Amino acid sequence: LYQKALHTPCYTKLSKGESITASILKDVHWKETEKIITDQKTLYEELCVSRQDIPVASMCAIEYYEDSLLPLARLYNLERELDQALQEKIWLKSGGFLIIQQTEAFVAIDVNTGKHSSKKDAEENYKQINREAALEIARQLRLRNLSGMILVDFINMKNTNDQSELLQYMGSLVRSDPMQTVVVDVTALGIMEITRKKSAKTLAE
């Protein structure tokens, strides 16, 4: 680039950043993607051409959507989905819920029993809620593109056997994550430590 600059007139563009199309293709997890739909004609054409350089992308359909009466964003309720994806509180099917908070130093995730507060077989209920929470946490890490240090406060994590089982389960869930994700350990206070490689901005950013 330096050598090029030496022999180029002033105000000449020496380089340009990655195109939107290239950025999109780079971030697609092709093995898990069946179809890409866009309502932007130019982007559609660029995607069709660019994906030819990616062998694994050939199995993914690229569709151009055109309907002036029903925009693509409204068809898939994108605004509502995006709003939900940015909420701190996420309800679980069991009645429990997660609280996800991002700070500059780490991501804190708190698991709560919520509406699921039956005292009968409490220990077993806690284990079920924790497993359900682990599954949702693995999904949220990818959905929100959370990275760095992630600290998870599961319910009643005092029993070492329960800790070990949950560690293994969480490890199996993040194994399919395209970003390097490591379930480190459970601290003396019962907090699970997870690290996830940073690749781009979070959904909130």
What is the predicted role of each segment?
Residues 94-205:
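Conserved glycine-centered short motifs in functionally critical loops
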Residues 1-98, 103, 179-205:
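OB-fold/S1-family RNA-binding modules
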